[in-house]
């Protein structure tokens, strides 16, 4: 059942922010508002400062990749209002080449979150004070959480005793990629389990 306070908040935000929002979504007892790309800073500043909102805590920023969409990336901001005891998710959609305005001017703690999102997805943030990789190794190529990034990666690194240093080599698979069947009987699958033949002997 949806919390009545979230329904009231959604109505309030739609009235106050108007066309700065593309949509509001209720799912799993949570409220998500989708902001226009060019209005993300205004939206974040409003929900932080407005007396009915007070979402002063930014708890996370993350990316989501939808390769089939023109704007393939969602940038998701998780916010908390300690005074109202409410959580809010703000999303914005973008593509590989269009930067999102940095939230650092609104939430100073956004700096490392945006660096992580850039490192994992390649999402660009305009106005960021230090947009460089933070999790992957020096010289890493590609963005590992994109759906089109290979599971094995492109190179593997190891310490070479002879060279006395870390070296990078093309990935060599010790066995072929295997496709596991994770279907289990209680999920409704209809298939015969292998047996040792003892049941047939009893018949």
Curated annotation (Swiss-Prot):
One GO cellular component this record assigns the protein to is: plasma membrane
Its primary localisation, in coarse terms, equals: membrane
Under Enzyme Commission nomenclature, its number is 7.1.1.-
Task: Read off the SUPFAM superfamilies from this record.
Answer: Nqo5-like
Q: Which UniProt keywords apply?
A: Cell inner membrane, Cell membrane, Membrane, NAD, Quinone, Translocase, Transport, Ubiquinone
Q: Is Transport tagged as a keyword?
A: yes
Report how it sits in the membrane.
Peripheral membrane protein
State the reactions this protein catalyses. a quinone + NADH + 5 H(+)(in) = a quinol + NAD(+) + 4 H(+)(out)
Q: Sorted alphabetically, which PROSITE patterns does this protein's record hold?
A: COMPLEX1_30K (PS00542)
Location comes to:
Cell inner membrane
Per its record, what are the GO molecular function terms?
Answer: NADH dehydrogenase (ubiquinone) activity; NADH:ubiquinone reductase (non-electrogenic) activity; quinone binding
Record's subunit section? NDH-1 is composed of 14 different subunits. Subunits NuoB, C, D, E, F, and G constitute the peripheral sector of the complex.
Stated role: NDH-1 shuttles electrons from NADH, via FMN and iron-sulfur (Fe-S) centers, to quinones in the respiratory chain. The immediate electron acceptor for the enzyme in this species is believed to be ubiquinone. Couples the redox reaction to proton translocation (for every two electrons transferred, four hydrogen ions are translocated across the cytoplasmic membrane), and thus conserves the redox energy in a proton gradient.
Entry's family note: Belongs to the complex I 30 kDa subunit family.
The identity of this protein, by name, is: NADH-quinone oxidoreductase subunit C
Species this protein is from: Bartonella tribocorum (strain CIP 105476 / IBS 506)
